[in-house]
Amino acid sequence: MIVGHGIDLQEISAIEKVYQRNPRFAQKILTEQELAIFESFPYKRRLSYLAGRWSGKEAFAKAIGTGIGRLTFQDIEILNDVRGCPILTKSPFKGNSFISISHSGNYVQASVILEDKK
């Protein structure tokens, strides 16, 4: 049974402005593994990746119902499976989780569905 659904839409240019003012912003948002992937990309791809992870983590926080206020960005990790699809590899939710991240132009959108294991 679905117990939560969260959606987030983010402008990549807004993330870029924050990142330009504070390059440590990526360290606040990304886990150690995510940061290693982020650092392997050229600049434009870094922005897209960072915005996607931001949006995915915001969508997760909305799906679980707490918002980021009760979670930290470090509580949630989004990596890719062998096909390149995003997966939630770390979160406080014990059921099944499904995530989709889509990029189009200056926007990134993420959707997270949480499902009870019963």
From Swiss-Prot:
SUPFAM superfamilies: 4'-phosphopantetheinyl transferase (SSF56214)
Subcellular locations according to the entry: Cytoplasm
Binding residues annotated for Mg(2+), in chain numbering: D8, E58
A cellular component term, taken from the record's GO annotations: cytoplasm
Coiled-coil stretches noted in the UniProt entry, renumbered to this chain: none
EC number: 2.7.8.7
GO BP term, example: fatty acid biosynthetic process
The protein's required cofactors: Mg(2+)
The keyword Glycosyltransferase is assigned to this record: no
GO MF, one example: holo-[acyl-carrier-protein] synthase activity
NCBIfam families named in the record: acpS, pantethn_trn
UniProt name for this protein: Holo-[acyl-carrier-protein] synthase
